[in-house]
Structure formats: C-alpha cells, structure tokens
C-alpha cells in the first residue's frame, strides 16, 4: 500500500503534446474552417504558379490599351499605362501573401523564443523583457508600424520588418504565459532536477506544449499582416513601382474608381478574400484548440 502511494506521488503528469494529425481530423468537422482552408490553398497555389498563370507581362506598358474594361483580351481590364491587371493581381500575390507569411514567421519565432526565455529565466531578465513589450504595446499598432516603416525607408522589405517588430510583443506575452504554466509540470521539474539545460527545457517541453495557442495567434496574424502590408503599400511606405503589390495597385487606382471601377476592385477583392480566408481559418483553429473560446477539444 505504501509502495503504491509513493509511486503515485512521483508519477509524472501526462504530457499534452501538439498533435498535427489530430488537428487535421478535427478540422473535417468544421465546414467554415474547411472552406477557408480551401481559399487559402487556392491563394497559395496562385502565389506559387502566378508566373505561369499570367496571360501577359505584368510590367509591359501599352499606352494604346490604357484603362480598358474587363474583356476576353484582358480579363481584369488594364491600368492607366495599359498593363494587364489580371497578370498584375496574380503576380502581386507573391509579394502580398508572402509578406504576411514572412512577417508571422519572423514575429512568431522571435516572440516565442523571447517569451519562453522570459518565463523560464524570471527575475530581472523577465522584468526587462516584459517592460519593453509593455511600452511597445502601449503605442497603437498602426501608428508604430507607420513610424518604423517611415524611419526605415519605403520598400517592401522594410515594411515587412516594421510589421514583424510590432507583432513580436503579442507572441512574447502569449509564450511567456504558457511558459509560466508549463514549467510547473511534474515532468518539467523532474527534467530540471536531473540537470536539463534551460535550452532543453524550452525546446523539448515548454515550446512544444505552447504550440496550440501560438498556432492560433499565427493563423490570425497572417490576415492582419497582409492587410497591414497593403496599407503601407497604399500610403507609399511599402512596395514601390513598378512592382505589382495589391495595396499599391489600389492606391494607383483610387483616382479612377468612379469611372474605371475594375482598377481598384480586383486587387481590393484579392486583399479581402485572402485576409478573410486566413481570419476564418484562424477562428476555426482557435475554436478547436482553445476550450475557453467555446470550441471543441478532445
């Protein structure tokens, strides 16, 4: 009897690792999430194969075909210098969608690592990291992003860097909160007792158990990052001419919106469809992985 009590006292808690295959199986029961996933897959395929799907050279100027409406020759019409809008929207997906993916990758990796370090180290290091994050969060995201992009200079790379910097604090706070919980688990304490390094604890225990909320945050952030990159492109702080970026295309077409509606409509629709697809997918992932959000979790 005493032996069984001692054994149960030292038995480690069950590890709840992220299971990607189980997540895919759960997604099948959510039609809205499946629909958004189909939209995302189609947009990603468009991004990858856009050079071969484009019907014209996206940067070819033809002043004899300027501002033509949608037709069999130009499916989305043409812009003010005769460039084919269908080809530019397709090729522009490489910049707009890739910008969102790169931003989330940078912010997610740096923010998750800083958050886990802050939660594991504690003390002064934790206080310094979190005070810096609090200062960044106290400034409106759009204002801080525009200020950083203006300071770095107008280009797509600088715009992505500015957006990523602004998004880092969200991942830091999320990862730190998870680290504070996971580090109290019995198996983590046992690994620490047996001399496991902090990097081992972060990589093999804390970070892996923090994946579900981080994936939710990332899936929601991609749509926001695409919108933010388009916003910077619209105001001239993102991609520059003659590159085909959706936000810059909408900015160029705003002077023709009353008569040549197609100039703004098609790149704007691409931004809307992509952002909504990623946001709906993020909502579906959150409902499945976060029980506090009212989703299903088994």
UniProtKB/Swiss-Prot annotation:
Periplasmic topological domain: 55-96, 239-260
Domain ABC transmembrane type-1: from-to ranges: 97-282
Membrane topology: Multi-pass membrane protein
Stored InterPro entries: BP-dependent_transpt_permease, MetI-like, MetI-like_sf, OppC_N
Any Gene Ontology CC annotation: plasma membrane
Major localization class: membrane
The entry's keywords: Cell inner membrane, Cell membrane, Membrane, Peptide transport, Protein transport, Transmembrane, Transmembrane helix, Transport
SUPFAM superfamilies found in the cross-reference section: MetI-like
Presence of keyword Ubl conjugation: no
Residue numbers on the Cytoplasmic membrane side: 1-33, 118-124, 167-217, 282-298
Localization: Cell inner membrane
One Gene Ontology term from the biological process aspect of the record: dipeptide transport
Induction entry: Induced by RpoS in stationary phase.
Example GO molecular function: dipeptide transmembrane transporter activity
Transmembrane segments annotated in the record for this chain: 34-54, 97-117, 125-145, 146-166, 218-238, 261-281
Protein origin, superkingdom: Bacteria
Free-text function comment from the UniProt entry: Part of the ABC transporter complex DdpABCDF, which is probably involved in D,D-dipeptide transport. Probably responsible for the translocation of the substrate across the membrane.
Family membership: Belongs to the binding-protein-dependent transport system permease family. OppBC subfamily.
Protein name, entry field: Probable D,D-dipeptide transport system permease protein DdpC
Provenance organism: Escherichia coli (strain K12)
